[in-house]
Design a protein with these regions (language model features):
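Secretory-pathway ectodomains
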Residues: 1-487
Length: 487
């Protein structure tokens, strides 16, 4: 329940204003707990001082990675320890062993290899030296059997052409840092999904393919399952693991690796694929950028039930069941179909455009809250990717709420309540549209497509934050004023 900020302060003398500083605030009170400079103000030095990664709150201390080493502070600001492990970008902690792991980016030292350091509870380095890993580390998981590390070579997740990227999976001995596998399993592409399961690890490849390996690195499937490219969804269902890619969908038996449906649902490659579950009919509803399908969860029998065209060449971003009807939307488009795919309405409102949009931040509060959740999950020792149950509201929102409920403070209890609200079906869609007078904010009913509320501002470059959970609009009305509207 702390907010940690690093940068340069605007107050103080000239030397203080150009010296990097860290400040810690209490989220419950909004008051500053303490602050400190990373170097002595006014002191001439050739060393660069800066915070290099996210700070972590753990074991009644705040651990801060900097360009000159890792620093641990008490909540009152006392320095508990510091070491010389420089340029750590990511910190992970293990509650069971009271151990700290830090990842140093190879790019910061002109290397193609990232480096992993292990520290004890007092910041002392536990391994003789950091363990070098080929490529950029994209996934780091602490398990009871060892440390699983996925790294991406030749550009990794930031590469434009996914086919040029290839991942490696390593499994390290937590005691020594040595690789426990004589031979790493073949990936033949970029690892897009990576989950710990009961008997090993399950992973999906961006170029297509799903495989499961044991904790000793052996394949548990007879052969990797071939899938379409870009696996957008991997989730558990009563029938097995459902996967949805940019061009196909099926369910896998996780014990055998065989598909449950005799034939996969195949469709023309789509930039966006969204899905939901119709509990009443026992069908998955899958929507591509132009076509909607209904699939029987048990047999895999499917049929195309609707086709559509989004204005402004938008792609669907959300789908949900509204009773027996199907709601499909993007930023500026809203569709409602009955359960047979017959169109009930289509509403479209022209977007403000890039020049008019300014710094509008739709859903910024929800995004910030999700990022905070991910950080707290790592701090709590739950730094594992989550293979959730496929359900009507989605596993991620449910996990967000569960994570905060385990943190016993008023601020996080309030956050849990907000996430519970986000799990519940919302009845309206909020969008911005261009009007003759400026930019208008519309609140529309998902069930009817009708306008429920409207707000227009003459500001050509408005700054908004919309809290879609509690239905508030925060609007910067001038340089010193933030106005709040109930929407």
């Amino acid at each position: 329940n702390k907010l940690i900020i690093s940068g340069f302060q605007k107050t103080g003398n000239q030397a203080e204003s150009v010296t990097p500083k860290v400040a810690v605030y209490d989220l419950e009170t909004g008051e500053e707990d303490f602050s400190f400079f990373l170097s002595e103000p006014g002191k001439v030095t050739m060393k660069a001082f800066m915070v290099t990664g996210d700070a972590v709150m753990w074991d009644n201390k705040i651990i801060i990675p900097t360009s000159q080493g890792v620093i641990a502070k008490s909540f009152s600001g006392e320095t508990l320890w510091e070491n010389g492990i420089k340029n750590i970008t990511n910190i992970y902690v293990d509650d069971k062993t009271k151990t700290i792991y830090g990842i140093e980016s190879g790019a910061l030292r002109g290397s193609s290899k990232d480096k992993i350091y292990k520290m004890d509870i007092n910041g002392k380095e536990s391994w003789e030296d950091g363990v070098k890993i080929k490529g950029v580390i994209s996934n780091f998981q602490i398990t009871d059997q060892g440390i699983a590390v996925v790294s991406d070579k030749e550009g990794g997740s930031s590469t434009i052409s996914f086919k040029k990227a290839e991942s490696e999976i390593a499994f390290l001995d937590a005691a020594t840092g040595e690789d426990l596998w004589d031979k790493a399993p073949k990936t033949k592409g970029y690892v897009q999904h990576f989950y710990e399961v009961e008997d090993g690890f399950l992973f999906g490849i961006m170029e297509g393919g799903i495989n499961k390996i044991s904790f000793d690195g052996k394949s548990l499937f007879k052969k990797p399952l071939k899938t379409g490219e870009n696996i957008m969804t991997m989730a558990l269902s009563p029938q097995g693991l459902i996967y949805i890619t940019s061009e196909d969908a099926n369910i896998i038996n996780l014990d055998s690796g065989e598909t449950v449906w005799k034939k996969p649902l195949k469709f023309k490659r789509s930039e966006s694929v969204v899905s939901t579950y119709d509990e009443a009919s026992g069908k998955y509803i899958i929507a591509t950028d132009k076509t909607m399908f209904a699939i029987d969860e048990n047999t895999g029998d499917f049929k195309e039930i609707a086709s559509y065209k989004f204005d402004e060449k938008e792609i669907p971003t959300d789908i949900e069941m509204r009773g027996s009807n199907i709601y499909l939307s993007s930023n500026q488009n809203m569709y409602l179909f009955d359960n047979e795919g017959k169109e009930i309405y289509h509403e479209y409102y022209k977007s403000p455009g890039i020049s008019t949009f300014g710094k509008i931040a739709l859903g910024a509060l929800a995004v910030a809250s999700t990022a905070l959740m991910a950080h707290e999950a790592a701090v709590a020792g739950a730094n594992k990717n989550y293979l959730g149950q496929y359900n009507r509201v989605g596993a991620q929102a449910q996990r967000n709420a569960d994570m905060f409920e385990g943190i016993a403070t008023a601020s996080f209890s309030a956050m849990a309540k907000r996430f519970r609200a986000s799990v519940a079906t919302k009845d309206s869609h909020v969008l911005l549209t261009k009007t003759d007078n400026g930019v208008g904010l519309l609140k529309l009913s998902k069930d009817t497509g009708k306008i429920e509320k409207e707000l227009t501002t003459k500001d050509k470059k408005p700054e908004y934050i919309i809290d879609e959970i509690d239905d508030y609009l925060y609007y910067v009305s001038d340089s010193q004023t933030v106005s709040i509207f109930k929407i």
